[in-house]
Regions:
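Active-site segments of SGNH/GDSL-like serine hydrolases
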Residues: 94-116
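Secreted/periplasmic serine-hydrolase-like ester/acetyl group-modifying domain
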Residues: 1-101, 188-208
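A broadly tuned "polar low-complexity/structure-edge" signature
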Residues: 6-8, 12-15, 26-30, 44, ...
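Acidic-and-aromatic substrate-binding clefts and catalytic sites of carbohydrate-active enzymes
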Residues: 81-85, 111-119
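C-terminal regions of proteins
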Residues: 117, 121-207
């Protein structure tokens, strides 16, 4: 069913991706008319709406790819940070919705060697304007506190591996615990599955 909201989304998607067309969203036949070639028995099988996973959306990367921070990493260059306007707009909408629901927001930047000082400063300004907290794992202060070692804690230049993710998670957990009034639900019956999943995760990853 076409609505004003759906129409606005279609216009934004097609403007951002030239491979997408308005017609294919308004008239699905244009998008799926070749689908008959791909249909198989799996398409007839019912699928659960939710799939349980002990990883909770996390992908642990065991491989180690020795890296080195680029020369001048996170030092001022005078360049202007540019962000996708659509991404910023939707971030603003998400923050506004969270505030409406009484949910505190923390903007988080995870380790990435292509990050820059200017982008970090721009995001910090954006967070201040939105009235939310901002944590940047690429600032020297937090990198030092976390203890990330580019020689062993990275999967590639844009992702930490399993050991790196443990360091990041421990720091972030401590930060959230010390900064916000978060209840500890460990051991509570209503959250028992989380305790079970944690133990299974630790055993699977060898972190136990």
């Amino acid at each position: 069913k076409l609505s004003t909201y759906k129409w606005e989304i279609i216009q934004e998607v097609t403007a951002a991706d030239e491979r997408q067309t308005t017609l294919s969203y308004v008239f699905p036949l244009f998008r799926y008319h070749e689908r008959w070639k791909e249909v198989n028995l799996a398409d007839a099988e019912p699928r659960p709406l939710m799939k349980h996973s002990i990883k909770k959306g996390h992908v642990y990367l065991r491989d180690i790819s020795p890296q080195a921070y680029p020369d001048g990493f996170m030092e001022p260059t005078g360049e202007t940070a540019v962000f996708d306007e659509s991404a910023l707009a939707y971030t603003e909408k998400s923050i506004a919705l969270c505030k409406e629901k009484g949910i505190e927001v923390v903007l988080l930047h995870l380790p990435k060697m292509s990050w820059t000082y200017e982008k970090s400063q721009a995001m910090e300004t954006f967070a201040e304007e939105q009235g939310v907290d901002y944590v940047d794992f690429d600032t020297e202060e937090i990198r030092t506190q976390v203890g990330l070692d580019p020689a062993v804690d990275y999967y590639d230049q844009g992702h930490v591996n399993l050991t790196g993710s443990v360091k990041v998670s421990e720091w972030l957990g401590n930060y959230l615990d010390q900064t916000y009034d978060l209840p500890d639900h460990r051991g509570e019956e209503a959250y028992a599955q989380w305790d079970i999943d944690l133990q299974a995760y630790l055993e699977r990853t060898g972190l136990s």
